[in-house]
Curated annotation (Swiss-Prot):
Species this protein is from: Pseudomonas fluorescens (strain Pf0-1)
Pfam families in the cross-refs: Tyr_Deacylase (PF02580)
Protein name as catalogued: D-aminoacyl-tRNA deacylase
Family membership noted in the UniProt record: Belongs to the DTD family.
Reactions performed catalytically: glycyl-tRNA(Ala) + H2O = tRNA(Ala) + glycine + H(+); a D-aminoacyl-tRNA + H2O = a tRNA + a D-alpha-amino acid + H(+)
Locus of motif Gly-cisPro motif, important for rejection of L-amino acids: 137-138
Oligomeric form and interacting partners: Homodimer.
Origin superkingdom: Bacteria
Keyword terms, alphabetized: Cytoplasm, Hydrolase, RNA-binding, tRNA-binding
């Protein structure tokens, strides 16, 4: 499972012009599920997302986690993040989980996040989404389980 996290001052996801998820300060995370992923993969990614130290402390060092600052978590499914881009000029999606597995594990991740963190929002799995964000930094990390 991959999570491309971006520290944001705010972010929102729209589907057909309707806002379906938004957060203020926090993390926007694009999530890709791969064929061998399990609920344990999702739990490991969630632990990292909530505890990865990407927010600045009083001295300006990245020493604070999402949990420490009480920021929002916006999860957006993005199967293209799992693409194989090693050869050719067209990405292959054979390294992405089938849609049924992807949706099941994304929903599991979202459910667990809502149990463990205060402010959690999401996009809509499989939908054509427009993602709006104000990057903070920018600070971006690719986390893999």
């Amino acid at each position: 499972m991959k999570g491309l996290l971006q520290r944001v001052k705010g972010a929102r996801v729209e589907v057909a012009g309707e806002v379906v998820g938004s957060v203020d300060q926090g993390l926007l995370v694009l999530v890709a599920v791969e064929p061998d992923d399990t609920p344990a993969s999702a739990d490991k990614l969630l632990h990292k997302l909530l505890n990865y130290r990407v927010f600045s402390d009083a001295e300006g060092k990245m020493n604070l986690s999402l949990a420490d600052v009480g920021g929002g978590l916006l999860l957006v499914s993005q199967f293209t993040l799992a693409a194989d881009t090693k050869s050719g000029l067209r990405p292959s999606f054979s390294t992405a989980a089938p849609p049924a597995l992807g949706e099941k594990l994304f929903d599991y991740l979202l459910s667990r996040a809502k149990q463990m963190h205060g402010t959690v929002a999401s996009g809509r799995f499989g939908a054509d989404m427009q993602v709006h964000l104000v990057n903070d930094g920018p600070v971006t990390f690719l986390l893999q389980t």
